[in-house]
Amino acid sequence: MGNKVREFMTHREPDEHIWVERDEDGLIGTVRAGQRPMPRIRVFDLLESHPGGSQALVWDGETLRIAAEQVKGREPGLTRAADYDLIFFQFSGASAIESEYGSIELEPGDVALIPAGIAHRTTGKGECLRLRAMSKGAVNLGVDAEKPLTETRFNVSHSEPLSAHNGAGADENGRLLEHITFWDPTSDLWIERRAAELVGCVKEGGRGLKKLRAFDYFTGMTGKGGARAPVLYTGEEFRIDVYNLEGQQRGFHRGLDEDEVWFQFRGHAVNDTEWGIVELDPGEMSYVPRGIAHRINGGKGFLRMVFYTRHLIHPKAFNSSAGKKTSFTVE
């Protein structure tokens, strides 16, 4: 008999935790057959070798897509996601976002929701690297944007920074193209607009534009049985929460009706899973397919963002597609 550990099984509906006792050695590397192994993806290393060099789709599902992207200077046109919500999570550099709701600026660790139907464009500052999450279903705030519990600032440095050179976009008063995008891209449209007439033009209604400091809502250390992970955004099929676990998680978790997509923001992580041990460093991603037991061993300063989806999601890019291997330091 091996070391006895606890495992908790969860469903999104009903919201329940079922605790069981198992042998630890039966929960690490014991998958013998299956079609959804867990990759370790250096998502920003994909950009240099990806066509166009600015965006790489990393995860693709029926109701959720996640891409890694670099914004080099001012985007040449506007974008309006017609029938899906956008969430931007800033990893390095900064994003100055102009939209029909007004303007905000994202720094490392900040996240913002662009509601469906709202035109926007970004000016990237420094090495502007971020995640773009696309949710087919409507998403709402899970925390109060005006009431973070702490005020944390981050400095992110890259071992081999990507080139940030880009030709300037259209003049502020000039005309440019607005790309109206749809979940099914065969419906996409390009319409000529005057940018100055769109920025801040919404007078009332809708969900607005607010940024969150993603890692400033912790009430304690997550994963130890006390403080719960703050839920930043939530919808019927999708949610985002964050974790700050240092040390070993209280028990193994087995989510039975959701896939989990992990983004490691800071610190090293050793993840014990039935697929084996998966390690992650800052700027890397993996996922846990539904039904797989897993346990986090978080290193010093561990911070992670997790995207949950009730529909299947699949990796669309792998390290074999990356032209080089780089690393990040987050302080």
Predicted regions and their residues:
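A hydrophobic/aromatic-rich effector-binding and dimerization subdomain
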Residues: 129-173, 318-330
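A short, N-terminal "cap"/entry segment at the start of jelly-roll beta-barrel domains
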Residues: 1-68, 75-78, 150-241, 331
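Acidic/His-leaning functional-site neighborhoods
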Residues: 225-252, 256-263
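Short strand-coil-strand connectors
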Residues: 62, 98-102, 125, 272-276, ...
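Short, conserved beta-strand element in jelly-roll/cupin
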Residues: 80-97, 133, 244-246, 254-271, ...
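Short acidic-glycine-tyrosine-enriched beta hairpin
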Residues: 100-117, 274-292
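Ligand-binding loop in jelly-roll beta-barrel domains
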Residues: 116-147, 290-316
